[in-house]
């Protein structure tokens, strides 16, 4: 009885995995058919699935007039942390946006910091600057913001990624 139940669950799991693989392939085919996919995938280290999630969460890019709208949609804009006359030094991101988009950007930035020299330099610069150095997580948040601005510019101006354009050196 136990072996039969176990075999049934294994078969069900394998069937679901194959269904997920088919759905994932269909998603990637649809994503690659979009003209915006070319520009998003030109960023080294940004995978097709992550780029597809970002584009799916954003929707039609032509609806947005500037990168700040994408940033607000993701909920990664910094918000002042004040109460009355008190101003705390830490400025968190708002988190009032799409969590899935924020998560995709977070993992994309982690990968880019490891693989892209320009992002790695910018990450170090945020942490080591003399005035207002950022913690590791704050630097990642700032890079999420920067990545979304770059992606917006690539899609808006129909350009491929240039590691020296838009990042300080």
Predicted regions and their residues:
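A detector of single, family-specific signature residues
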Residues: 1-169
